[in-house]
A protein has these predicted regions:
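Weak global preference for isoleucine
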Residues: 5-8, 22, 27-30, 39, ...
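Rossmann-like NAD(P)(H) cofactor-binding subdomain of soluble oxidoreductases
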Residues: 64-151
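Short linear motifs at secondary-structure transitions and domain/linker junctions
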Residues: 2-5, 20-22, 59-62, 87-90
Length: 151
């Protein structure tokens, strides 16, 4: 069964998308307009260095079984997806567009995974005995996580 997957972020997201495309899933990358235009026109390529090989292995999204599209955050409805991936660096979630989409993701209750450079604050809140409030200043803007239910 193929799934519709929303990935916020094209840089980290392309790496994860390349793996998911092997499974025949449909991926939508949320990114900046110039990135979206390029991905929609030419797909993306991920180069993976492999020990013992002179050249990296190149994964071309156009040659994989799944389908990838890209676009900005405006107008994206998380409820249209089976899974959301958080694939941007933590400070980027406070930017206009990303902040609103992240809030919509939280309120949609669609399953959400993260490959961020630090764990989302609601994920940290699940750790028993940890002073969650003491960690809020470590985030660029901890309020972007307030709509998420850590359960």
């Amino acid at each position: 069964m193929a799934y519709n997957i929303l990935l916020m972020g094209a840089s980290y997201g392309s790496l994860l998308a390349s793996k998911l495309l092997f499974g025949g899933h449909s991926i939508h990358l949320v990114c900046l307009p110039p990135e979206a235009e390029l991905i929609n026109a030419e797909g993306f390529r991920v180069r993976l260095p492999v020990r013992g090989r002179a050249e990296p292995v190149v994964l071309d999204s156009r040659k994989l079984p799944g389908k990838v599209t890209a676009g900005g955050a405006a107008g994206v409805n998380p409820a249209d997806y089976d899974l959301v991936g958080l694939c941007m660096q933590e400070p980027q979630y406070r930017s206009a567009g990303a902040r609103e989409l992240l809030d919509a993701v939280a309120k949609s209750r669609v399953p959400c995974m993260s490959i961020m450079n630090m764990p989302p604050l609601p994920y940290v809140k699940r750790i028993p005995g940890l002073d969650y409030e003491a960690l809020r200043p470590a985030y660029a803007d901890a309020t972007v996580w307030d709509s998420f239910d850590p359960k």
